[in-house]
């Protein structure tokens, strides 16, 4: 998560939460891009800790690099544009912020294995190193809702674990049978927003399975070549709203699990093959995750 730290926190009476936050930044879990003056304040704060015999070599090394990076940014003719919004840390909320920032960010999904595996494979394929690293380090966790029925309530409940920096997002299927039909899950999205869930993405197409590349289905259903061929033959607007479970195994059949097989390396081209807008939408999902990481 990108932080906006008020340097007044360095003058407070309780240094513990400040040290905790700076340590998280030094380890690369969160980001802070201070101005040159703010970086110097941070470096002075870390120097005082060192003088007080508090051994924190990682912080000392980070503070020096942060000052150098701030100087480089100030001399740049082109300021950075875009990126995630910053989270404000002040002397008034630093303790609560430290607690929130030390917890894993939460993505509420219908199925932890299926949807979670898809998000992981998607992040690798689209070269989102931040999300991949966060998943590897368990800085981002999946919360399993077991379907859409209680998803909003569960996401709202997850938000209660945070005090000032709510790091929760929700990823939900639209369950739409076609592009013209409103999603039956719109009410769940509205309920989640009213309950304080800050980040929600509803898939444009029917469900997560509709975003799974052809290569995955070819591996799962080697004995159903005609079914896979039919899938490839549909235009994106047809394929995106088909119920793929019914297509491959029938209403009462069982889909492969895990959805995204381990060991299969996918690329951006595999997702782009599904339709011209697919990669852009998946990058929106990743951008949402950056907001809570």
Regions found by a protein language model. Name each.
Residues 1-86:
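N-terminal extension/subdomain marker
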Residues 17-20, 58, 207, 230, ...:
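Exposed alpha-helical structural elements
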Residues 63-176:
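RecA-like P-loop NTPase motor core
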Residues 122-126, 215-216, 220, 289:
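Generic structural signal for hydrophobic core residues of well-folded globular domains
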Residues 183-261:
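Activity-critical C-terminal alpha-helical subdomain
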Residues 240-293:
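Terminal low-complexity/disordered tails
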């Amino acid at each position: 998560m990108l932080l906006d730290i008020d340097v007044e926190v360095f003058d407070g009476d309780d240094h513990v939460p400040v040290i905790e936050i700076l340590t998280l930044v030094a380890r690369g879990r969160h980001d802070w891009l201070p101005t040159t003056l703010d970086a110097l304040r941070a470096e002075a704060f870390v120097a005082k800790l060192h003088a007080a015999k508090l051994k924190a070599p990682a912080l000392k090394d980070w503070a020096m690099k942060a000052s150098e990076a701030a100087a480089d940014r100030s001399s740049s003719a082109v300021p950075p544009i875009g990126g995630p919004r910053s989270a404000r840390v002040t002397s008034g909320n630093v303790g609560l912020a430290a607690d929130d920032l030390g917890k894993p960010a939460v993505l509420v999904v219908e199925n932890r294995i299926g949807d979670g595996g898809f998000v992981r494979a998607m992040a690798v394929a689209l070269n989102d190193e931040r999300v991949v690293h966060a998943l590897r380090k368990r800085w981002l966790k999946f919360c399993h809702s077991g379907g859409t029925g209680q998803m909003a309530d569960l996401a709202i409940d997850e938000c209660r674990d945070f005090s000032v920096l709510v790091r929760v997002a929700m990823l939900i299927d639209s369950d739409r049978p076609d592009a013209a039909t409103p999603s039956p899950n719109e009410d769940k999205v509205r309920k989640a927003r009213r309950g304080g869930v800050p980040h929600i993405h509803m898939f444009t197409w029917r469900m997560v399975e509709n975003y799974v590349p052809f290569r995955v289905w070819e591996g799962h259903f080697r004995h159903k070549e005609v079914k896979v061929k039919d899938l490839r033959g549909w235009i994106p607007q047809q394929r995106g709203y088909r119920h793929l479970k019914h297509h491959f195994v029938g209403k009462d059949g069982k889909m492969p699990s895990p959805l995204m097989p381990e060991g299969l390396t996918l690329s951006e081209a595999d997702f782009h093959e599904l339709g011209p807008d697919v990669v852009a939408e998946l990058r929106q999902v990743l951008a949402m995750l950056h907001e809570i990481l």
